Amino acid sequence: MAADFAASVILDTALSVSGLTDYLRLLLEHDEQLRQVWVVGEVSSTNHHRSGLFFTLQDPDGSAAIKCVVWSSQVPKLAQLPVAGEQLIVLGSIRLYPQRGEYQLSVWQAVPAGVGLQALRYQQLKNRLLAEGLFDPQRKRSLPIHPQTIAVVTSPTAAAWGDIQKTLKHRYPGLHVLFSPATVQGEQAPESIVKAIARVEKDGRAEVLILSRGGGAVEELACFNDERVVRAVAECSIPVVTGIGHQRDESLVDLVADVCVHTPTAAAEKVVPSLAELSNQHRQRIIALHQVLLHTQTSAENQLQTLRNRLQNLRLDRHLQQEAQKLNWQRQRLLQLTMGRSQQAKQHLELLRQKLISLDPKSVLQRGYAVVRQENGAIARSADELAVGNELFIQLAQGEVKAKVIEVEQRQ
């Protein structure tokens, strides 16, 4: 009797295989932590199938393993394909299959274990911006050949700013440079850079913009992978040249910029030509033109002598006279052409020489002008910038004078 009662109780409380499986599936698939879980491990095996990519992820010591699947529609979205022997971090959810009594991880994303989430976010943003066409070569704009005003966005305390100033002054004296300071490292950097670019656009004078900073660790350059900064560069109304760091990975700002170089100095060299190099190129062209003219003249003289010899052999006075007149006309025409081109070349060279002289700040000072600087070294361009009592440094053609403002008159 007792045995029958015990058997009846067990039978009433016993679960079927499907009942137990359904219960376990509810526990696994409805657990919030298991619906989106990151798992790190080593890929021990892979199997490519028409329906998807199947692989096993295990601990390095082999003490535990889990089967994983990436369905075919999701495979192209993976940042890293599973390869046997490699360490991966995968993102997925737990699924239980009643027929086999097995559970496995349905994977949505996989990244190398040594790179982590930051690389994943970088790749996802890069793919999204690429799909929008922000990196298309057709979007790249040409830089102005001879800009009169450029803007620079960087930190006022960075060595990059000094390198850019030195390069611009050496290559293109007289250039007007607008400086829009920004923080280029840390959490506040993206917003600061976006505001600095906006200031340049609002000012409206710059023809090209340099966005730059010196070298640094990858984490220090994170602001140049920020979506806000990337879109600000992409939407900028003037061409943008980036010069970020010396040895670094490619940043998203580099990809979207119109021109990308590796250093602040190289960025400055990109936006302006070297007047000295231009002058030398023009001299070389004049020399080449002179050589061409000499060659043409020599060739014509040789041809003329050949014709003379032929005419002498023909002994036809009338024909000789006609040919002599024709050759004389050709000679006069050649001389006129040679003199004309030579004069044009001289005028062009003189124009370049005068332009170089006019761009030389010392030449301007020799004509009686002066450069007035405030105590902080900034050039005073308007009486509005000055106040009574300010000390000024006046640079003349010969020497420098220190003065103090005793009265300020506003121009009506």
UniProtKB/Swiss-Prot annotation:
It comes from the Bacteria. It catalyses: Exonucleolytic cleavage in either 5'- to 3'- or 3'- to 5'-direction to yield nucleoside 5'-phosphates. One of its GO terms (molecular function) is nucleic acid binding. InterPro entries: Exonuc_VII_L (IPR003753), Exonuc_VII_lsu_C (IPR020579), OB-fold_nuc-bd_dom (IPR025824). One of its GO terms (cellular component) is exodeoxyribonuclease VII complex. Its EC number is 3.1.11.6. Keywords: Cytoplasm, Exonuclease, Hydrolase, Nuclease. It is found in: Cytoplasm. The keyword Endoplasmic reticulum does not apply. GO terms for biological process: DNA catabolic process. Coiled coil: none annotated. It is an enzyme of class 3 (hydrolase). Signal peptide: none annotated. Heterooligomer composed of large and small subunits. Belongs to the XseA family. Bidirectionally degrades single-stranded DNA into large acid-insoluble oligonucleotides, which are then degraded further into small acid-soluble oligonucleotides. This is Exodeoxyribonuclease 7 large subunit.
